[in-house]
Regions:
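Short S/T/G/P-rich N-terminal loop/turn motif that feeds into the first structured element of a domain
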Residues: 1-70, 79-88
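Short, exposed beta-strand-loop hairpins at the edges of beta-sheets
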Residues: 72-74
């Protein structure tokens, strides 16, 4: 199991992105990705962070590849994503 921290920019408001994020959570959970936290930078609601647990970095990448279109339609600017991986 890994913990991933994803930081990225969005093209819409945080509220709009968050609504789409919540809508897609059942798909993510069914795929084995479990969100621990999400939020935005103070004073900058266009810079978002998501912290999640999943099986492996490869598992997360496969999910992103399969669901990239839905992620982009939420306002997530995919090419802005910076990922940090932690293991225990």
């Amino acid at each position: 199991m890994i913990t991933a921290i994803l930081k990225f920019d969005i093209s819409n408001t945080f509220t709009q992105w968050e609504q789409a994020f919540y809508t897609h959570q059942p798909v993510a959970r069914a795929a084995g990705l479990y969100e621990l936290y999400h939020g935005h930078e103070p004073g900058n609601d266009k810079r978002v962070v998501v912290v999640l647990n999943c099986l492996s970095e490869e598992h997360m990448q496969k999910f992103i590849e399969a669901n990239g279109k839905a992620m982009a339609s939420s306002g997530h600017i995919l090419e802005s994503t910076v990922t940090e991986i932690y293991v225990n």
